[in-house]
């Protein structure tokens, strides 16, 4: 016969907290990083020919240099396209400016086509033109120190018709002279943009480099490498290497702590997380430290860490786990709603929502001994004794320490004289 027990299900938060969702410090690795290089070609008034002096400008020379780099290293660079946006300043007739802007578009595109041909580099050139660049005009005007700036801005807001705008602005004789020398020349232009990607190492290349010499990898590549395996030992090895190569980065320490929590190595987890916190006191680290505190039964300390993890993606789950520990079961179930974890199921059991608990347990991603144990509790509380014994047998087969807990758990009181139950817990 089993000795008189106590209702022990509520104390299981110490165990379920260990397989709650931890938070890893994510890598920022990108295989392809979007880049762009811009240049500007300026034109003389009413002209569309590209002057040699413009091709010698720093911006154009830098753009050509980037095109050469892309051509010479197509493993590291990948061109997307080239954009050409040509403009005419907003003086003169709309018809004339439309034709002028189009000619500027064509002349700048022709220059690029020649450069690409000489380099034997393929790229799409997307072109467009704006007949009268009123937006650019307004932007430059607002940033200027022109005396009549506010008056001209009011004219722009009062008149939508381009030709009427020009008439009104020309009436400001002194103001227009300043515009003609300071603003309008800047609008007679074509903007060239090379869009390309910086290409990083592939998954296979990162893994190969890790094996040959991990020190050659960036911290982002190392952290990313850990995501390429599901094996916990391999992850730990990569994170340990990362702490050696990049000791100032908190993420690898934090992630080692997260793995240690899942493995039930709380002292090891505490050590890693303490080191992580010394590098950066952030939500991810505090979330994991809260779970350790809950697993150790230190509710007050857990509450402190939870309060410092408000931006964590698992904040609601942390609050739910904390409320289970504090005995606020209805609030806990509400905070954990939708979380497919043992803690969520525990909260639902303690809030006596057995249907929800059963559904949650059937959807736990990495079901373990505690999942089976909680299934046994649900079955026992709903009068399904045979199912309770079956699930309890599965739980004890995975974690023999649950024998002692089951033997004293009054949720199984109706089984205390059941021979199958007695054989399981003896």
List each model region and its residues.
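N-terminal targeting segments with Sec-dependent signals, encompassing both cleavable signal peptides
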Residues: 1-375, 379-394, 400, 404-408, ...
